[in-house]
Amino acid sequence: REAAERSKMIDRNLREDGEKASKEVKLLLLGAGESGKSTIVKQMKIIHEDGYSEEECRQYKVVVYSNTIQSIIAIIRAMGRLRIDFGDVARADDARQLFVLASSAEEGVMSPELAGVIQRLWEDSGVQACFSRSREYQLNDSASYYLSDIERIAQGSYIPTQQDVLRTRVKTTGIVETHFTFKDLYFKMFDVGGQRSERKKWIHCFEGVTAIIFCVALSDYDLLLAEDEEMNRMHESMKLFDSICNNKWFIDTSIILFLNKKDLFEEKISRSPLTICYPEYSGSNTYEEAAAYIQCQFEDLNRRKDTKEIYTHFTCATDTKNVQFVFDAVTDVIIKSNLMECGLY
């Protein structure tokens, strides 16, 4: 009788484990460097957990300041390389001052002098001209977000808002894991560093992943790649997508494509033609047509079109409402494919 009881218990445990496994969703976030993966992770914390506490926000102050200072420095350095002059010659003194103050600044402190220097530089017409040519050098996406708001963030009492935190940029190294529950599912999301050297470390770790969310920065189409400057970033991203989408490890994994930074793309497409990236493109440089073309370029890489569907969404990872809406749709796809596997659909 004890044996029978024990065997019943084992059965029950196995069944519970099975149910738990069917409710556990492993999501892998992939994509080239700076495509928005970590921003999506931050949004999950804001949408599905309680967001960032005041204490956590305070800790981001250091990053906000360093992102802001690094951005203005990058623009000033590029002015030299691109031979752009200041609109007002007095700004040259401010630029020298910037380097001195930035190198001696205490972490997480923005002195009124430094804030004043940054504000005067940012408002200079030469600096703005250089900023508008940022595709020719490396500049943080959030540069104008912080620099235009320097007065607010330089105040002594400043505490970063959720949006300020979303905009911070810190290179992801290693694997960042986040857990949350949504629609009765237990999500485990893995954010993997996008820079190339990181890739070989993780590709085999993720058998049994429910879905891959692959992020692409639409606005990268006119940029050069940071790591080796040889290949356009969009082509680099397509190459990575090709290797993931057609990878033997991921034959049964749902692939969800986030064509991200749609806001920056929409802003750029009117002044930087898509032919920079796709010389054969003959459509118009409107957001709809150009975005649809990029979507086809990625979806056409799928070599198993008859058996594998790619679920594409246009996203703006810094926009909480948009991410919430898209993630809701993604979850429905996951629930549906889970039910199909269990034969319940």
UniProtKB/Swiss-Prot annotation:
Gene Ontology terms describing biological process: adenylate cyclase-inhibiting G protein-coupled receptor signaling pathway; adenylate cyclase-modulating G protein-coupled receptor signaling pathway; cell division; G protein-coupled dopamine receptor signaling pathway; GTP metabolic process
Residue numbers spanned by region G3 motif: 187-196
Principal localisation: cytoplasm
Region (G1 motif): 26-39
Span list, region G2 motif: 164-172
Binding annotation for Mg(2+): S38, T172
G-alpha domain boundaries: 23-345
Subcellular location: Cytoplasm; Cell membrane; Cytoplasm, Cytoskeleton, Microtubule organizing center, Centrosome; Membrane
Region feature G5 motif, mapped onto this chain: 315-320
Residues given in the record as GTP binding sites: 33-39, 141-142, 166-172, 192, 194, 260-261, 263-264, 316-318
Name of a matching Pfam family: G-alpha
Keyword terms, alphabetized: Cell cycle, Cell division, Cell membrane, Cytoplasm, Cytoskeleton, GTP-binding, Lipoprotein, Magnesium, Membrane, Metal-binding, Nucleotide-binding, Transducer
GO-annotated cellular components: centrosome; cytoplasm; heterotrimeric G-protein complex; midbody; plasma membrane
Alphabetized SMART domains for the sequence: G_alpha
Membrane topology reported for the UniProt record: Lipid-anchor
Main function: Heterotrimeric guanine nucleotide-binding proteins (G proteins) function as transducers downstream of G protein-coupled receptors (GPCRs) in numerous signaling cascades. The alpha chain contains the guanine nucleotide binding site and alternates between an active, GTP-bound state and an inactive, GDP-bound state. Signaling by an activated GPCR promotes GDP release and GTP binding. The alpha subunit has a low GTPase activity that converts bound GTP to GDP, thereby terminating the signal. Both GDP release and GTP hydrolysis are modulated by numerous regulatory proteins.
Family: Belongs to the G-alpha family. G(i/o/t/z) subfamily.
Quaternary structure annotation from Swiss-Prot or TrEMBL: Heterotrimeric G proteins are composed of 3 units; alpha, beta and gamma. The alpha subunit contains the guanine nucleotide binding site. GTP binding causes dissociation of the heterotrimer, liberating the individual subunits so that they can interact with downstream effector proteins.
Name under which the protein is recorded: Guanine nucleotide-binding protein G(i) subunit alpha-3
Organism name: Xenopus laevis
